[in-house]
Amino acid sequence: PHDQFIKIGDDLYYISSNGRTGNITIDGKDYYVGRYGRVLRGSFNVYQEPPYYDDETGEAVKKTGFVKSYGRWYYIEEDGKKAKGLKEIDGKLYFFSNNPMNKYETNEQVRGQLARPYFYISFPNRAEDNPTYYFDAETGAAVTNQFVYADGHWYYFGKDGKALLFDQVVNGQHLYFDYEGKQVKGDFVTDYKGTRYYDENSGELVTNQTRTINGVTYHFDEIGRAKQL
């Protein structure tokens, strides 16, 4: 048989008399036929670019919203283009990769990892200009108002999804996070306020006590300033 669709197992094939593959139009409908005549279904093309090919028929369709293709998630805007960078959807913040230096960038959704959307800004004027976020592994939404342990460090993400930086009070505890949002635990911090120490377990600022750390004894006053004894 020639010039017809055939279902074999879970796959759909198009048998053509001239062996056509790639982008083809059949009865006014667009399809993508790969090697051996297999019809692409339930994804974008191999370059992860729209249009989207229907899950069942393989017909090119206009699709909007979240779309899964080759195991990765994307968001299609009303104009048919993929979302790029940070995007608020239904009150939640998402991030779609957007590296201007990568010509193969596909704008896939970031899930289950830390991300700095403006990572290509090598030397921002302020740490706050290049915030760190964590995007949930299941939904891809930026987590808010919670601690997250990622890449060997603790972070706390505020109500806007940004990792807290520097001196912060979280749940009544005085904590410190570096310029990337990593929580300081079991270490000293020195700045215009003096030298302070943050507990190795809780990360809380040590105050009003004497401690021996790495063989050296210090007294910490009411605001945490260390004085070597």
Feature locations, PLM:
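Extracellular adhesion/carbohydrate-binding repeat motifs centered on closely spaced tryptophans
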Residues: 1-229
